[in-house]
């Protein structure tokens, strides 16, 4: 299944794009339910670098792009041995107390909090998109992204993770 709500946005699909041919190890990491856990399993030092926390325009990658729609956002880089390998954005409505509190975790991984607590949320299937030719001001050189949406008591958290070329050097 594929869909696109904005013609300049990526085409999201439930399988890895046919044009993207990752190694078996990278394919496994891309499809891991918890990217935090998958990156921590690598023989490298894993860290999170908080880039931004607060109100911002919605991400085009989460179909919240466009003027006039503000979200509470958390932008981070996931790093291996200090090198950024993933750029990620999580966003929710400013009125979402639960998800805002969840996102306020500093340099701790969001995945650590999401998967450590009792899962009283539902998660959508992972979706993938090739990013070639998509103008993304926040992300340099990302070739692929994945996203999913977490639902809890009629409140939604969107999460997009953009994979940077440096990741291949750690696999």
Question: PLM features: residue spans?
Answer:
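Composition-driven recognition of glycine/serine/threonine/acidic- and proline-rich low-complexity segments
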Residues: 1-171
């Amino acid at each position: 299944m594929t869909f696109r709500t904005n013609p300049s946005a990526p085409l999201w699909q439930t399988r890895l794009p046919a044009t993207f041919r990752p190694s078996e190890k990278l394919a496994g990491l891309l499809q891991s339910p918890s990217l935090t856990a998958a990156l921590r399993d690598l023989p490298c030092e894993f860290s999170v670098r908080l880039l931004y926390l607060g109100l911002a325009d919605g991400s085009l990658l989460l179909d919240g792009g466009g003027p006039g729609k503000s979200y509470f956002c958390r932008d981070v880089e996931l790093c291996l041995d200090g090198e950024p390998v993933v750029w990620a954005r999580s966003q929710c409505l400013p009125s979402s107390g639960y998800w805002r509190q969840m996102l306020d975790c500093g340099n701790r991984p969001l995945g650590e909090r999401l998967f450590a607590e009792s899962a009283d949320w539902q998660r959508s299937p992972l979706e993938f998109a090739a990013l070639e030719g998509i103008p993304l001001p926040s992300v340099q050189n990302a070739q692929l992204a994945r996203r999913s949406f977490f639902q809890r008591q009629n409140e939604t958290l969107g999460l997009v993770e953009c994979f940077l070329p440096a990741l291949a050097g750690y696999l």
